[in-house]
From Swiss-Prot:
A single GO cellular-component term on record: cytosol
Known outcome of mutating T334A: Abolishes nick joining activity
Annotated consequence of substituting K290A: Reduces nick joining activity by 87%
Gene3D superfamilies: 5' to 3' exonuclease, C-terminal subdomain (1.10.150.20), 6.20.10.30, BRCT domain (3.40.50.10190), DNA ligase/mRNA capping enzyme (3.30.470.30), Helix hairpin bin (1.10.287.610), Nucleic acid-binding proteins (2.40.50.140)
Signal sequence region: none
Protein name: DNA ligase
UniProt xrefs under NCBIfam families: dnlj (TIGR00575), PRK07956.1 (NF005932)
Positions of the record's site feature: Interaction with target DNA: R487, S492
One Pfam short name: DNA_ligase_OB
Residue ranges of domain BRCT in the record: 593-671
Known cofactor(s): Mg(2+)
UniProt xrefs under PROSITE patterns: BRCT, DNA_LIGASE_N1, DNA_LIGASE_N2
Keywords: DNA damage, DNA repair, DNA replication, Ligase, Magnesium, Metal-binding, NAD, Zinc
């Protein structure tokens, strides 16, 4: 007679086998009812013997309790995005760039896949067992969705087969088939629940549930398309070979993956998929085209946040016709005035569209748009609604000219348009309510001053009630004043006050980024902070001095110089410092007096480090007299390459710049 352990092992093995046949091979051998019977038998045995339950059991897909919030997972290898092409000419230009970059006229073959319209995820297996899963997030850090991913039956909790790597990070797309999407919405309408606009939104909403039991009820599925971390094992040296190996281990791969021998075959694949698109049963918005050879991929490298060896060939966006009811003008954080078309609502690609951006005055002139016109609306990339053209043959007689404002629609200040720029801007600065709201929202955001609990709606109310006019006013708020806001009780109000107090202790780089200087993002702010060290030195810097900072050109230097030249901005900064905003004093370093191999050198870090964080490494390098830059140029003296170094390493090699690895960096730091 079999032992309980043997029965459990056999049931789990049988169920995993049938999950593989159903989800990966699309060739089920048993009816659903038989699968359900086996699952019930396993569940009953595990209920009687809970001490024998294993984490990879098919019964353990459903989490037991909701989470309070998602924690973060940092991607060991960044999840990069892809560049897009939208027509054959652009694809052929991409193909030529690839051919030109490869030496010796090497033959290029292409692995072509469907571009699924879902949610990109990363799944980590250790010794074949699923241990974590994360969303793409910002490409560097994503949300921990492990409990939810475990509920998706297409994703194996344990890989099967031989030669499975010790650590394998699989990347792919979670999506919702059309039939499942329609059923979710049908159930929602019947029960008065939330109706989703399209399958992608439904997939994202299902996967980002704090309660995995809800995710388990949604018929999500998954196809894998790539690899991140790979340790303690090997994979084939072609992209297609890797996908086929994934399939052998039990991971689902689309059966539409195709190897193409030429650009002509790629175009034929694209048109065939476009033709079949309505019958696939799930949403796609194009095809993904990748160089098949891993060696060639490595040779081609990366640029910015995308590989040079892959591209997304998007399908033409879906279009509809409707009428322009009116054109209104919105004011953004930097004073940019953007015209927005208010439309007769129309469904485009499954979404009800009632507004579309018109970008600027030049675009209105190019379109020849008048209020009342019949227009063609497109969801560019199936996401952002835009006006494609005016249907002049059906123009009504009572259309009206669109008049671009000469004064800000919010504060009445003059509108100016700098010669050579397409964007018109309000000159009202912080006296403009619209700019004030957006500036304050940026100021408190996570990557800026990081004021926890200070959401957009709170900022809106604070500005509308005239409690806050400048960022410094935020630090004068009391719990009593906040309690008067909508949905803000005494406890929540005190939490916000505490968060503001905590935010006073920041870094020079975060403070600069929070000020919202035009063209100054996080990387530029960090570069300015590292180079000048103190606010006083930065405020006094000339445009010429500012351009000595790595990655700062004449445009950014001018914006920074003009910002600090404006008295109202200096006054706001003084108020912030008076309210207690502060950061650690810089370590004053004279590179000439430091006996260090890094002294006086411009250094760039790339890839992931295993022995210390990037921030710690930067701090140590600066202490030893280095200037740490964000990108590689002819001014770069040294590149430190960690794991999965990408385009920066390739550029350094191209320019003949010295490159060292993490081990050598640590040795030099120790010396």
């Amino acid at each position: 007679m079999e032992s309980i352990e043997q029965q459990l092992t056999e049931l789990r093995t049988t169920l995993r086998h049938h999950e593989y046949l159903y989800h990966v091979m699309d060739a089920p051998e048993i009816p659903d009812a038989e699968y359900d019977r086996l699952m019930r038998e396993l569940r009953e045995l595990e209920t009687k013997h809970p001490e024998l339950i294993t984490p990879d059991s098919p019964t353990q897909r459903v989490g037991a309790a909701p989470l309070a919030a998602f924690s973060q997972i940092r991607h060991e290898v960044p999840m990069l995005s892809l560049d897009n092409v939208f027509d054959e000419e652009s694809f052929l230009a991409f193909n030529k760039r690839v051919q030109d970059r490869l030496k010796n006229n090497e033959k290029v073959t292409w692995c072509c896949e469907l571009k699924l319209d879902g949610l990109a995820v990363s799944i980590l297996y250790e010794n074949g067992v699923l241990v974590s899963a994360a969303t793409r997030g910002d490409g560097t850090t994503g949300e921990d969705i492990t409990s939810n991913v475990r509920t998706i039956r297409a994703i194996p909790l344990k890989l099967h087969g031989e030669n499975i790597p010790a650590r394998l990070e699989v990347r792919g797309e979670v999506f919702l088939p059309q039939a499942g999407f329609e059923k979710i919405n049908e159930d929602a309408r019947r029960t008065g629940g939330k109706v989703f606009a399209n399958p992608r939104n439904a997939a994202a909403g299902s996967l980002r549930q704090l309660d995995p039991r809800i995710t388990a009820k949604r018929p999500l599925t998954f196809f894998c398309y790539g690899v991140g971390v790979l340790e303690g094992g090997e994979l084939p040296d072609t992209h297609l070979g890797r996908l086929l190996q994934f399939k052998k281990w039990g991971l689902p791969v689309s059966d539409r993956v195709t190897l193409c021998e030429s650009a002509e075959e790629v175009l034929a694949f694209y048109h065939k998929v476009e033709e079949d698109r309505p019958t696939l049963g799930f949403d796609i918005d194009g095809v993904v085209i990748k160089v098949n050879s891993l060696a060639q991929q490595e040779q081609l490298g990366f640029v910015a946040r995308a590989p040079r060896w892959a591209v997304a060939f998007k399908f033409p966006a879906q279009e509809q016709m409707t009428f322009v009811r009116d054109v209104e003008f919105q004011v953004g954080r930097t004073g940019a005035i953007t015209p927005v078309a208010r439309l007769e609502p129309v469904h485009v690609a499954g979404v009800l569209v009632s507004n579309a951006t018109l970008h600027n005055a030049d675009e209105i002139e190019r379109l020849g748009l008048r209020i009342g016109d019949k227009v063609v609306i497109r969801r560019a990339g199936d996401v952002i609604p835009q006006v494609v053209n005016v249907v002049l043959s059906e123009r009504p007689e009572d259309t009206r000219e669109v008049v671009f404002p000469t004064h800000c629609p919010v504060c009445g200040s003059d509108v100016e348009r700098v010669e050579g720029e397409a964007v018109a801007r309000c000159t009202g600065g912080l006296i403009c309510g619209a700019q004030r709201k957006e500036s304050l929202k940026h100021f408190v955001s996570r990557r800026a001053m990081d004021v926890d609990g200070m959401g957009d709606k709170i900022i809106d109310q604070l500005v509308e009630k005239e409690y806050v006019h400048t960022p410094a006013d935020l630090f004068k708020l009391t719990a009593g004043k906040l309690t008067g806001l909508e949905r803000m009780g005494p406890k929540s109000a005190q939490n916000v006050v505490n968060a503001l107090e905590k935010a006073k202790e920041t870094t020079f780089a975060r403070f600069l980024y929070a000020l919202g200087i035009r063209e100054v993002g996080e990387a530029t702010a960090a570069g300015l902070a590292a180079y000048f060290g103190t606010l006083e030195a930065l405020e006094a810097a000339s445009i010429e001095e500012l351009q000595k900072v790595p990655d700062v050109g004449i445009v950014v230097a001018s914006h920074v110089h003009n910002f600090f030249a404006e008295e109202s901005n200096r006054n706001v900064i003084s108020e912030l410092l008076a309210e207690g905003v502060h950061w650690p004093a810089p370590i004053v370093i004279n590179a000439e007096e430091i006996d260090s191999p890094f002294a006086g050198k411009t250094v760039v870090l790339t890839g992931s480090l295993s022995q210390m964080s990037r921030d710690d490494a930067k701090a140590r390098l600066v202490e030893l007299g280095a200037k740490v830059a964000g990108s590689v140029s002819k001014k770069t003296d040294l590149v430190i390459a960690g794991e999965a170094a990408g385009s920066k390493l390739a550029k350094a090699q191209e320019l003949g710049i010295e490159v060292i690895d993490e081990a050598e960096m640590l040795r030099l730091l120790g010396s």
